[in-house]
């Protein structure tokens, strides 16, 4: 487990928060630790990151496990990817709502009474709002990356919560079938976005 730029206790350089930036961090960590090949798991936005890892350095990837991955949506590219102070200020004003809303990612959020406090801790780190906004502005459609992964015959496994209201399977299932027709797929009963 590692904290990526702009998340948790990591550094938060003022860089565009792209899939490539975060994938490169993981690749550097693997190289630093002497990991030659690994099974890689990505939860939610982490699915985008593992796709990019396989795109950049497919030889490092044994197989890919996508858990409630947000990487299968189509995105219109944003022209102005700069993050402005007014956007940061507006997001910070919404922090209390954001933290409370996190429990809705679970099937039974009341079973995780400390989750709000834990998320509020993330929000205290300098640059957190800027990183989230930059991430959103830098989202791109990954269809070509996924088709490349499929063509390389990298085994792909997808896992979905039956009650996920964040990443809604029916909104992208046709696209997913086109890019990963050979995947192994699993649905988790009594699970929301976070499959705890």
Predicted regions and their residues:
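Active-site loop/oxyanion-hole signature of alpha/beta-hydrolase fold enzymes
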Residues: 4-41
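Active-site acidic short loop of glycosyltransferases
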Residues: 31-40, 58-59, 153-154, 181-182
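Catalytic nucleophile loop
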Residues: 42, 46-47
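Flexible "cap/lid" loop of the alpha/beta hydrolase fold
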Residues: 48-56, 62-94
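Conserved alpha/beta-hydrolase catalytic His-Asp/Glu region
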Residues: 75-81, 92-151
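Short beta-strand/loop motif that positions the catalytic acidic residue
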Residues: 152, 158-160, 164
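Conserved alpha/beta-hydrolase "acid-adjacent" motif
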Residues: 165-171
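Catalytic histidine-centered segment of alpha/beta-hydrolase-like enzymes
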Residues: 191-196
